[in-house]
Structures are given as structure tokens and as C-alpha cells.
């Protein structure tokens, strides 16, 4: 059994850890509010831009469709972008994204597809490099950025555009964590190329179907400009969702750690009191026995 001094040191150590986890929880909560506001503010812009592209795409057919919209006509070469965190202590936040990406990667490899990977965040890079080091073509460390803007997303979009225009990839898919609430963040796969123009954007396109528009310049020329911008915006929106999800996961993880530390302190304190009481009782018995012997 540990001595009383060792038990006191253990209790003090856990209390110090509890103070750290509590402070980290409060910091994560403050950053979560800012990150959540930024993510929610970016979504309407991203949705509206996608809706504009859907409306324009409805008037483009055949060979006039830009490459980012029409695609290459093949799906043999895939680029998987895995956006996760640069820091840890956030529960299973990064692991859930990497797990979803790995499932897609393994499926594509089993189908004989050529798979390339772009990693965003040191944690995703560390996990995927152990498994697919020969498939990673680029990795991005965003730990130096406190806020994500278009200037952060642009270099990532440039790499995607370069690989696509060089004919190295046919399909580009981004894996990230969709922020829904503090307790719900869902690993999500978003196809970036060929650009998707249906689904959530269909109602917006349908509303414009009743009117006939004449565009100057043409729809094709406008799309040639908007599609690269849309690529950057969709990546930025995913990064902002990721940041909010990371701080939500970290806040939850630190809250759980603080509670667990409290439980450990109670348990260690109880053990300490019992040991101290037993030691006092033993000393009293020795004193009484000695007095009776005299």
C-alpha cells in the first residue's frame, strides 16, 4: 500500500491536472462560439454560390460545359482530400474523419482505382502517412492560422486545380466533419470535382426555370470564373465546419476529463482518509498496549 505522503502527492497531482483540463474546457468553449459563428456565416454564401452555378449549369449542354462541371468522363483516378485537426485532445474528432476516408480509399483501391491523397492538418497527415505514404501528394499544416479565410483555402484549391488540369485525377472528394451541434459532428464526403449542381441547389434552380435570362458574357464563360471560386469557397466552408467541430469535441473531451479527475480525487481522498484512520488506530493500540504492559 502507498504511504500517506505518496497518496497526498497523488491527490495533488490529479488536482493540478483537473485545473488544466478545466481551463482548456473554458478556452475551447470561448473559441467554439467564435468558430460556430464563422461556420454558420459562411454557409449561406456557399449555398448561394452553388445555387447560382446550378442555375447557370442548367443552360449549358454538351461540349460547352467547363471541365470542372462536366468532368473527364472517367472515374479511374481519384483525389481524396482529408481535412482534420492540427492539434489533439479532442476525443475521436480526427479519428472519425480518417476512418471514413480510409473506408473510401480502401474501396477504391479494391476496385483498381488510382488514388491520391491530400492531407489537411498534422493529425490526419500523421495517421494516413503510416498507411498510404506513397499516395500522399501534398499535406498542409494550418496550425499557424487562428482564423480561416479564403487566403487559407486558396493554396489547397490551387493544388486540386493543378492536379485536375494536368489530367492526374478525374474525381475529387473532400472528407471533413460537418458541424451540426455541440454534440453532433458528422464525418462527411463532399464531391468537389465534377462539381455537383443538384440536391440542395435544385429548388433554387427550379425557381429560375420560369424566367428566361440572357447572359453577357455567356453561361460558359461565367462558369469558367465561378467554378474555381466555388472550389475555394467549398473548401473554406469545410475548414470552418472542422474548426467548430474540433473545439466542440475538445470542450466535451476536457469536460469529461475534468469530471473523471473529480471522481479520482474523491476516490483517492477516501483511500487516504481510510489509511490515515487505520494508522491512527494502530498507533493508539500500540500506546494502550504499552501502557498496560507497564
Swiss-Prot record:
It comes from the Bacteria. Pfam families: ATP-synt (PF00231). InterPro entries: ATP_synth_F1_ATPase_gsu, ATP_synth_F1_gsu, ATP_synth_F1_gsu_CS. GO terms for biological process: proton motive force-driven plasma membrane ATP synthesis. GO terms for cellular component: plasma membrane; proton-transporting ATP synthase complex. The keyword Ion transport applies. It is found in: Cell inner membrane. Keywords: ATP synthesis, Cell inner membrane, Cell membrane, CF(1), Hydrogen ion transport, Ion transport, Membrane, Transport. CDD domains: F1-ATPase_gamma. Its main location: membrane. It is a peripheral membrane protein. Signal peptide: none annotated. The keyword Cell inner membrane applies. One of its GO terms (molecular function) is ATP binding. Gene3D superfamilies: 3.40.1380.10, ATP synthase, gamma subunit, helix hairpin domain. F-type ATPases have 2 components, CF(1) - the catalytic core - and CF(0) - the membrane proton channel. CF(1) has five subunits: alpha(3), beta(3), gamma(1), delta(1), epsilon(1). CF(0) has three main subunits: a, b and c. Belongs to the ATPase gamma chain family. Produces ATP from ADP in the presence of a proton gradient across the membrane. The gamma chain is believed to be important in regulating ATPase activity and the flow of protons through the CF(0) complex. This is ATP synthase gamma chain. It comes from Caulobacter sp. (strain K31).
Amino acid at each position: 500500500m502507498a504511504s500517506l505522503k505518496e497518496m497526498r502527492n497523488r491527490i495533488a497531482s490529479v488536482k493540478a491536472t483537473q485545473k488544466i483540463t478545466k481551463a482548456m474546457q473554458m478556452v475551447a468553449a470561448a473559441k467554439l462560439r467564435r468558430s460556430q459563428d464563422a461556420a454558420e456565416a459562411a454557409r449561406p454564401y456557399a449555398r448561394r454560390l452553388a445555387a447560382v452555378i446550378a442555375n447557370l449549369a442548367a443552360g449549358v449542354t454538351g461540349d460547352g460545359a467547363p471541365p470542372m462541371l462536366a468532368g473527364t468522363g472517367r472515374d479511374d483516378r481519384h483525389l481524396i482530400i482529408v481535412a482534420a485537426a492540427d492539434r489533439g485532445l479532442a476525443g475521436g474528432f480526427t479519428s472519425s474523419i480518417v476512418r471514413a476516408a480510409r473506408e473510401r480509399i480502401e474501396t477504391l483501391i479494391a476496385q483498381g482505382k488510382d488514388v491520391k491523397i491530400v492531407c489537411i492538418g498534422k493529425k490526419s497527415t500523421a495517421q494516413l502517412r503510416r498507411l498510404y505514404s506513397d499516395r500522399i501528394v501534398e499535406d498542409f499544416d494550418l496550425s499557424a492560422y487562428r482564423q480561416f479565410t479564403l487566403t487559407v483555402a486558396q493554396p489547397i484549391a490551387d493544388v486540386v486545380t493543378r492536379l485536375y488540369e494536368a489530367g492526374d485525377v478525374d474525381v475529387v472528394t473532400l472528407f471533413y466533419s460537418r458541424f451540426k451541434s455541440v454534440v453532433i459532428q458528422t464525418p462527411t464526403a463532399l464531391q468537389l470535382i465534377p462539381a455537383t449542381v443538384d440536391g440542395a441547389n435544385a429548388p433554387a434552380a427550379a425557381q429560375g426555370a420560369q424566367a428566361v435570362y440572357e447572359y453577357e458574357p455567356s453561361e460558359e464563360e461565367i462558369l469558367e470564373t465561378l467554378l474555381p471560386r466555388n472550389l475555394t469557397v467549398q473548401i473554406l466552408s469545410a475548414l470552418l465546419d472542422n474548426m467548430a467541430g474540433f473545439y466542440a469535441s475538445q470542450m466535451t473531451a476536457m469536460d469529461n476529463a475534468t469530471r473523471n479527475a473529480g471522481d479520482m480525487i474523491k476516490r483517492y481522498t477516501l483511500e487516504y482518509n481510510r489509511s490515515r484512520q487505520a494508522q491512527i488506530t494502530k498507533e493508539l493500540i500500540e500506546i494502550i498496549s504499552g501502557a498496560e504492559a507497564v
